[in-house]
Structures are given as C-alpha cells and as structure tokens.
Amino acid sequence: CACLVGSEMCIRDRPYAIKDYYDVDPDLATSIPDRMKEFENLVKRSHKAGLKVIIDFVPNHVARQYGSDAKPEGVTDLGEKDDMTKAFSPNNNFYYIPDTKLEGNIDLHRGAAEPYIEFPAKATGNDRFDAWPNSNDWYETVKLNYGIDYMNGHSRHFEPIPDTWVKMRDILLFWSAKGIDGFRCDMAEMVPVEFWGWVIPQIKAEHPELIFIAEIYNPGEYRNYLFNGKFDYLYDKVGLYDTLRAITCGWESATAIPQRWQSLGGIEKRMLNFLENHDEQRIASDYFAGNGSKAIPAMIVSACMNTNPVMIYFGQELGEHGMDTEGFSGRDGRTTIFDYWSVDSIRRWRNGGKFDNKFLNEDEKQLKQFYTRLLNICNSEKAIREGVFFDLTYANLAGWVFNEHKQYAFLRKQDDELILIMVNFDSIPARSAVNIPQHAFDYLGIHRYGEYEATELLTGNTEKLTLMPDKTTPVLLDGMNGKILKFKL
C-alpha cells in the first residue's frame, strides 16, 4: 500500500500551483520553520506503519510568480537566466510573448489595489501562446519549456540537453533523497516523452525501487510513455474508469469491460485503476451514482481483475458526497482542490484524532468495512496479487440466467487456489449462474471437477458449488454487490 502526498506547493489565492519546487507548503506544517523536517518524519512514520509514500510531481507548469526561497545552494531558479526577448529558445525555461504585457480576459486585480503585471507575458500551462488567456485557461500557470518550439511546427530541440531537463532532474533527485517511494506525474503527456526516457533511468540508477506513475489520457500514447518514457504505470481513466462509471450509471453494458482490457493489448498490468481521483466527481455525488455503495461491483472489478495497482481517493471509502458549495470550486460533485475547506466525512471519521468511527453513520461504517476487506483481500490473496486472469464473458452471452449486460464474472488462479469473482451491477438481486468453459479448465490447469466448498472472502461465509466444464455454476448475488469465491483445488 502507498499513500499519495500532494505536491510541494504554495497556495496563491484561487490557484494551487507550484511556487517553489524545493519547499513544503507552510500551510501543511505544525511548525513552519521545521516543515521539511516534518515531511521527512512523515515519510519515516509511513514506512514504519508499512506504507510507502508517493508524491505528486507537476512538471508541465508552475505559478506565474514562481521563485524558490528554499533551493539548495548553487541552484539557479527557473527563468533566472532566460532571454525574454525570444518567444522560444532551447535554453529558456519558459515561453514568452516578447514586448507584450499580460492582459487576459480575467480579473488581474483579484482584490488587490494594483493589477498583476507581467512583462513580457508568458505562455499558460495549457499551451496558450498569447497574452490573452481567459477564465477557461490555466491562466494562473506558466508552461515550462522542454525544448519544443510549439509555434514553429512543434520542432524538437533536444541537443544539447535543454536546461529545463537538467533542472527538473535535480528536483526529482532532491525529493528522491528524502526516502520517498515514487512519483505521480501530473499531466505527464504534456511533457515530451524524450525527457521522461532520459530522466527516469537516471533517477532509478540512484533509487532503483522508485516507481513513476503517469497521468495520461491518450491511449495512442500509452506504449510510447511506457516503453520509451520508461514509466511503470499509467492512469486507466479513458478506458476502465469511464467504462465502469457508465455501467454503474446504467448507460453501458457490462460486456464493455472485456472490450476495454482487450484494447490495451497486453499492457493492462501496467495501468493504475481507480474510481475516484481529485479531478473526477465523487461516486456518491448527484452527478455519479448518488451513493457510494452503488459502486461496490465496479470497485471489486477495478481492484481484483488484474495484478496492477488500484488507487483509492481519500473519503471514497466513506462514501463522501462531494456536494458542498465551496468557494471557487462550487457545487460540482468534486471535493475542492482550490479552496480552504473541511471534508465532512473525513472530519467526522477523524474525531479530533481518535479515528474511532464514533460519528460515522451505519452506511459509512459498512462501506468502510467493505473497502477494508477488499483491499486486504487484494494484498493477502495470492491468486489476486499474483495470479492469472480469465474473463468469462464470452462463455455467458445470451444466457437465460446470466445477464451479461448487468453481471460480470472472471477467474483468478495461482498454484492450487482458484477465485471466482462475480458482480451484479443491477439494483435487483440476481439468481445467476455462470458457465465456465472447458478452455478455462485447460488454460488454468484445473483437473478436478465436481463439488467444492468455496469461501466467500468478503463475508467469510462458505458455499457448496460445483465446478464442471461447460456447466453452469449457480450463484446468488445481491443488488449492486458481488462475491469473491475462493476454491482450494
């Protein structure tokens, strides 16, 4: 298990953009002068508790007023030596709009007596290369220059190595030396893959156990960032997340699940699965399922269908609604990342540091118990942690008992342990029956047919079930729920 710690950022009004890559946000400290020591102690405590620490690394953009107060001796600030008369130079850290002041269709006062002044204007983090960003742009950020001249055919200038590459490598090495275990790289595909392929091997040469996770949304670039960029894992947002959300909401058939993993063509073990993150709407929000427990089938699939990692967003296990009307963020089904705020479910669970569940309601307690059991199953069961996967959808199409549009089933196998996982995306309980084809028995090396006593791992209950090639195995499923049935072969 790993805990993801937010970027080493400083907040400036609405934005939450990096002001200093070498510092810890003072707002997160108990004692501001000791904030770096507190971070180092957090890493040590996490390791002592059996956790690993992954921090957020935002390589594409920084705050417009970036300036490091905490950089090590001898380090030159980003932009400090830029030639601001040039729109692009491989030696610059930023992109400029020469001889032009930042104007923008935005409020440059933000309550201040004098407007914010920037001359010359810099390009925004979302690739706006003029001086007129609007409120839909990442106007509070400026894009870092990795040697691509976007305004001249995206021409690449990587020889000699651009200065930004060296600066960002040094930043990664700085945090790696703190004993962390990995980086979640924000919007990694907005940074050239050549940089990642250059920097990740250098970081791993000194810290071989570190992992790199890329936030990436373009399936056409997956292999590029895995094999040329050297990432360990990629976000599976536009594939499995979008599919499971659509099935949970009743917009899509469960038969879409095998289509999604098959489309990955063998890299599915390199994908990071999730049902919530800071950019997406909460499961329990009015914009998604309206109730955290309705995603139990999707969560079982996301966590158990392969050996790849799964991510849980804080409060997801409590069914946090994300329906507060926060300041800048507003009532959008997400927990704000822009405002000072208190998350209701987390606050009640925390209970002044007691973490005793006293102020959680029964639904929250039950959902938390489900997540606790599920994640422990993922770590403790060898067939799920290391085993092979066999999708049963193709053998259960157009059945009169198994509803392939609302139910999904698959097998996991390792050594003499077999696990049958079935979920029901329907709100109505199902008296289902799954057909396990002869090919599954052959592929998984199951040689004994007949009756078994299976243990349902989420509840601990036992069931007598018959495993026979091309014969249906009856399984009762509650609405919006699932079973994880373990057989000892």
What are the roles of these predicted feature ranges?
Residues 1-6, 11:
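Single conserved hydrophobic/aromatic residue that forms the stacking wall/gate
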Residues 12-30:
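N-terminal substrate-binding region of glycoside hydrolase catalytic domains
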Residues 17, 31-35, 40-43, 64-182, ...:
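Alpha-amylase-like alpha-glycosidases and glucanotransferases acting on alpha-linked glucans and related
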Residues 25-28, 59-61, 187-191, 216-218, ...:
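Short, flexible loop/turn elements at secondary-structure junctions
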Residues 42-59:
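Hydrophobic or amphipathic alpha-helical targeting/insertion segments
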Residues 256, 265-268, 277, 282-452:
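Loop/helix patches that line or flank the sugar-binding groove of alpha-linked glycan CAZymes
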Residues 450-470:
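Solvent-exposed beta-strand/loop surfaces of large extracellular or lumenal domains
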Residues 465-489:
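C-terminal beta-strand-rich structural cap/linker in extracellular carbohydrate-active enzymes
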